[in-house]
Structures are given as C-alpha cells and as structure tokens.
Amino acid sequence: MNWGKWLDYLYPPRCPVCDRIYADGICADCRKKLFVITEDFCMKCGKPLEDTQREYCPDCSRKRHVFRQNRALLSYRGPVKLSLYRMKYANRRDYAEIYGREMAVRLGPWIRRCKITRIIPVPLHRKRQRKRGYNQAAVIAKSMGRELHLPVD
C-alpha cells in the first residue's frame, strides 16, 4: 500500500460542507444545498445582485477597488459559511484544495473567455497567516492553477 492510500485510510477525505467521509469533493446531498452564483452578479466583486437591473452591488457602486473584476462561486451563507470558517481557522487545507478544484471546473469557461493568463491569490497579513498557519487563498489558487494549467503568482 502506498503512502497516499495509508493517509486516506488514517485521514479519509471528507466533504468540506458536511464533513462526512466522501472521496470526491462535495457530496451530492450538500451540492443540493449550495447557492451557486451563476448569473445576476456584481460585475466588480462577484456577489449576487438583488436588483438584476444593475451592474454593481451597492458596495461597489459607492467605492473604488484596485482590481477590475472578481468572481465568487458560492454565496457566503448557510453550510458554506461554516465550511469556510473551518477551512480558515481549523487548518482544513483539504477543503481549500476541493474549493479550488470546484472553482476551476465551474469558473473555467469564464476564466478562458476573459483570457486570464495567471492567478494571483490575495495576500494574507503576516499576523493572520501565523495565526491560521497558512494562506487559504494561496492554496485555493494553486489548486485552480493546477486544474486550469495557469501559473500562480
């Protein structure tokens, strides 16, 4: 038995949403509970829009950002909110890997259409990185980069 199989035996892969043992990312039950943002999203930050006649959410229409555009995959509520909390504060790097792959699959067509040539993770302040033990955005970005064959800076 190789090391990977031993690790899976000792620490079986889990669904990042419900934390039940599941070998392939997000389980089917949890997929049904997710609010995937597919349309009617802010053209600046990627949040879902309540007023579908607008291009920008109220926050982005009031302030300037240093980036051109951002996309979000999931709405930050319910089980996703708890899952992301565990990813950030309970050192669940495996969740970050899964979310990175999920983003690559679901946002890959948009990324290719926009002709994005590299992925740049949001830097994390040194104090926060020391406290959390890692930069979750960097792990997500590396996972996306592997799936999409894009460099990560």
Show which residues each predicted segment covers.
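Glycine-rich phosphate/pyrophosphate-handling loop used in enzymes and phosphotransfer proteins
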Residues: 1-153
